[in-house]
Amino acid sequence: MLHQIFRFNWKAWRALSAAEQQRITTAAINKLKEIAQAPAEAITHQSALYSQLGHKGDLILVHMRNSVEALNQVELQLAQTEFYDYLEQTYSYLSVVELGLYESTAKTYSALAARDIEPHSETWNAAIKETLDRQAAAMSSRIYPTIPEAKYLCFYPMDRKRGEEVNWYMESMADRQRMMHLHGMIGRRYADQVRQIISGSIGLDDWEWGVDLFANDPLTFKRLIYEMRFDEVSAKYALFGSFYVGVKLPIENLTAWLSGNLA
């Protein structure tokens, strides 16, 4: 999963003739549609465009692909367009969609311990793999999600604290499982209002996770995140990066956007 944040050079764009603007825009729309078109063999292949609010940028592109090579190919394809000459990438984020499996992991570990299976032994590893494979098959729609059609996007990266006094990774599995369960219960109350995609980025980018929230009412983002501020996981262990909010921009509406309109 790749997020690209761009600032648009409006001054340089306005210096072009109407004919040049139209030519560049048409080529950009065609290229973006080509990039978003999924090949038949792709498990997940999507790209979505958003008009960004605030000073951090003007456009957000979100890409979901099967591999980092495919994501890099998207970057290279975009860079070949003349439209790209008017974009300045101010931020990007690379991650992989993942599921929180604290509860199922705790149950699996307990079951293996009850059978006196030595942790990390060959038997242990085989049992863990079998469990993960079974869960992956059952939850494939969550592992390979589609980008929702919701009108608004809120993206932010985050960490779990690992300081000298407060360190998430030094807590026991049982305590982490308990806290994440309570944390998840808050999210479930908003399930009919917001769609969430969590992606992991340890070893891939500067933060540990990326969070994408999709909703048809932007105030839902505020209500959900505010309520979670009082949850132990967030209040005690969470660190948040910058927030990026955008309005869904269908690719064919790029012409209108370049004229100062969302539609």
Question: Which residues make up each language-model segment?
Answer:
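Charged/polar positions within long, soluble alpha-helices
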Residues: 37, 188-192, 222-226, 233
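Short, well-ordered beta-strand segments in beta-rich or mixed alpha/beta enzyme
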Residues: 4, 52-67, 154-158, 205-228
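Short S/T/G/P-rich N-terminal loop/turn motif that feeds into the first structured element of a domain
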Residues: 1-37, 66-70, 97-185, 216, ...
